[in-house]
Amino acid sequence: MVPFRWGLLLGCLGSALGPGAQAQFPRVCMTVGSLQAKECCPPLGAEPSNVCGSLEGRGRCAEVQADTRPWSGPYVLRNQDDRERWPRKFFDRTCRCTGNFAGYNCGDCKFGWTGPNCDQKKPLVVRQNIHSLTAQEREQFLGALDLAKNTPHPDYVITTQHWLGLLGPNGTQPQIANCSIYDLFVWLHYYSVRDTLLGPGRPYKAIDFSHQGPAFVTWHRYHLLWLERALQRLTGNESFAVPYWNFATGRNECDVCTDQLLGAARPDDPTLISQNSRFSSWEIVCDSLDDYNRRVTLCNGTYEGLLRRNQVGRNSEKLPSLKDIEDCLSLKQFDNPPFFQNSTFSFRNALEGFDKADGTLDSQVMSLHNLVHSFLNGTSALPHSAANDPVFVVLHSFTDAIFDEWMKRFSPPVDAWPQELAPIGHNRMYNMVPFFPPVTNEELFLTADQLGYSYAIDLPVSVEGTPDWTTTLSVVMGMLVVLVGLSALLLFLQYRRLRKGYTPLMETQLSHKRYTEEA
């Protein structure tokens, strides 16, 4: 099986979002002066001296802490990729916020907190099954996605060149682009999986910061939280929650691929989205990975064609089943060495889909997350382009729900996550690429309620793995029935013997009847 390789990109401008929408880099820091100084510590508000909200006790400008522990895996280069020791190829100093403050200038609150001083717990936002949404809730979700696709981001921009060429050929023009909110969501994913650029036509492909390792679960969790907060602000609804798609149907059809939800297939070309769906006009970004590698450049947000799904020819493939979810949730180890796509009996690797759902390894089999992407095919089939499809949002919401259920069942200690020798980007204290300000994997290795949200869901429990009182009672009752039966048989035999007396052994006639035959 070819390992998943995914991606995303675009440019951003103004709307109703705030400084907590943490993505690539804040526009205010993408100046020649800031890039040369490698410092992104903007003031909060109009007062220039209020750097990082320091006058209000919200934060200060500080040295970036980047993980330097050794990594393992196929990436063996050093100082060749601008994502190493993220984000120090770009900035050495950023705002470090205190308490529950957050954001590139400490002007926001951490997930799950609110109030002027970020000291008030927000009510949990509840992520529901997309099929359980009311007509109004469904329209709000779909409309918010479409609005995000067409609304420039107010605060963040993306880079269109790697760090050595970031200031342009003359060193005076930062190579950046604006993007829509949703396309920035796509770009973040693309950037996390793109190849290392070594020269024209010389990509180094053995690298992935968001897949094939422990960070798969935390990276996608933060990615989804980022979008959810952006949509909350875009809609003016702080209780807005992205729904999930329970893909564990075991069927060979996509039940969210309808015109009422995320778009049916177009009758005259089933690889395109039905023209009755708002998503039929969505164009994709960051799809031409080979072209970027040839030109030694990054995705710049140019539209590259329509969104596609291609389930034609996939009829023999079926989505995961509830039994697969049950098997995955029975795995007690979060991850196992080598913390890569060949780890066995690893909850993370089974959920990601490189292991079978029960944790055994079969290189010819895809399961769970990987299987769903393969099933959708088209734009969803490759990591660098998959997030273009809005199904990505509800697919990963359900994947995160499974992760959250595992966290609640097993309450793993923090050292269940390796501090070192995971693939690059996947050590516990590595700053997740390309989120900014920096945030580590460890900070997301929590239950969802600690991050301000929950799921309206009941996931299956393995009877074998988690015996309860009903199982014990069934066993006891079965034993009692057997004892009563034996007692009755003994009494009957005793009765027969008393009536007929004894028959000498030599005179006994042995029966040749089988147990399944009538006497």
From Swiss-Prot:
* GO CC list: cytosol; melanosome; melanosome membrane; plasma membrane
What metabolic or biological pathway is this protein involved in?
A: Pigment biosynthesis; melanin biosynthesis
Q: How does it sit in the membrane?
A: Single-pass type I membrane protein
Q: According to the UniProt entry, where is the signal peptide?
A: 1-23
> Which molecular function terms from Gene Ontology are attached?
dopachrome isomerase activity; metal ion binding; oxidoreductase activity
- Subunit description: Forms an OPN3-dependent complex with TYR in response to blue light in melanocytes.
Indicate the family of this protein: Belongs to the tyrosinase family.
Protein name (Swiss-Prot/TrEMBL): L-dopachrome tautomerase
Supply the gene name.
DCT
